[in-house]
Amino acid sequence: MSASILLCDGFDVRRILTGKLNGDESSTVTTEEDDEAVFSGEEWCGESSYCFYFVKQFAYDDPEIKAKIDEADHEVYHCNTDRIHIANRLKSKRAARLSLVASMETLMSMKINEVEKEQEVVRGRIYRLGERLSEIKMEIELLDVQMACVLNQRDKAVERIKFLRMQRDKGNAAFYQSRVVMKKAIELAASGNVRDLEELADSEVEKFMSRWNNDKAFRDNYKKRILPSVNERKLRCDVQIRDLEGNLDTENGNETVVKKAIEYKRFSTEEESDDFDIPVYEKLGKEEKEIDEETLKEKKREEQLEKARLAMERKRKLHEKAAAKAVIRVKKEAEKKRKELDKRAKKKKAVCKSSSVDVDRTTETVSEASKPEKEKLLNGRSVFPKQRSYNYRYHGKGNDAVLKAIIKRRKAYRLWVWTVSSAAVALPLALLVVFYYVR
């Protein structure tokens, strides 16, 4: 079988040759690799060959879709690099956070002496570590937000690439279908089934011609697909071999080919108005719309990132304010505790001094009070002394125990006075009674 590409009546055609030798019933197939082989005339004299033509469909890579796929692929690459960079930063920040937490735990678990200087140093270190830890937490939260945005952007780009590839494959459905047909034709040619091969070729050509005659969009699409192969083989758009003596310039590319194609003859007088209508302005309009949509998407994404950044700044400021308030509160509480401790120490000192003075005073008053009572009893004065009015001084909360002791001692003194006076009265009465009965 020989698979060679020919151009006939404006269509890109693939020719399949198959044949049999007179002396051999098995089919023989020649391929493109065998074209360079040298055969003798005796081998080819008895061969009967058949030639079938199939319309070849080309795969068309739309430049717009290709540009979009390249752009999305570039965006995915940038997103992956940003993700790796953010992941490395997150790893370092988390390691720093763990080290700070460990150092704070060691400081908290230390057995601190009661010396105030050491406590102040440790508190200052804990405060500085807490500030650094809060800053690292804010940075980690910001990096997490950036990571989520990057991953979301990458996922959208991947979905866009999948959609564009599906769109490209959908546009090249005719190409994949023609590949299946050509594979089947090659198999039939290899097996020597000429009848089925002829039926297949006729049916495919009829299908193509019916669509060519009835569908203008199909004609335009096929012309667009065939242009690259025509330009590569230096053929005209009416599919005739270029005139070597002509003044046609092939250096200008597809634009010169499309412009000069209008000057040549059309395939038929009915299709003169349908040939090579290239909607340049429509393409430009579509491109502008797509560019506007892309710019809007980029603006929305930038706005979202800006909003996230502002929100993180607000949170950071609130955390800083809360940390400053907490520090001020801790300082005030520490000052209050220090003042209370100082007051308690002063009160203890005052209580100790006042208790010693009161004990001395009570001993002196008891000794002084016992002397005049004895003198009064000896002089025969009144047994019941006058009660003296004592002016008690107000003492603080720490002198309650001392006051109770003084009151108890005074009560004991009064009882002792009452017993002595009653005994002094009872003795003379008893003596009188005894003398009366004795007489």
UniProtKB/Swiss-Prot annotation:
Coiled coil: 286-354
Location relative to the cell: Cell membrane; Endoplasmic reticulum membrane
Stretch forming the signal peptide: none
Transmembrane segment boundaries: 415-435
InterPro entries: PPI1-4
Principal place of residence: membrane
Keywords of the record: Cell membrane, Coiled coil, Endoplasmic reticulum, Membrane, Transmembrane, Transmembrane helix
GO biological process, alphabetically ordered: regulation of proton transport
Single GO cellular component term: endoplasmic reticulum membrane
Record's bilayer topology term: Single-pass membrane protein
Described purpose of this protein according to its UniProt entry: May regulate plasma membrane ATPase activity.
PANTHER family membership: PROTON PUMP-INTERACTOR 2-RELATED, RNA-BINDING PROTEIN YLMH-RELATED
Family that this chain belongs to: Belongs to the plant Proton pump-interactor protein family.
Name of the protein described by the UniProt record: Proton pump-interactor 4
Natural source organism: Arabidopsis thaliana (Mouse-ear cress)
Gene: PPI4
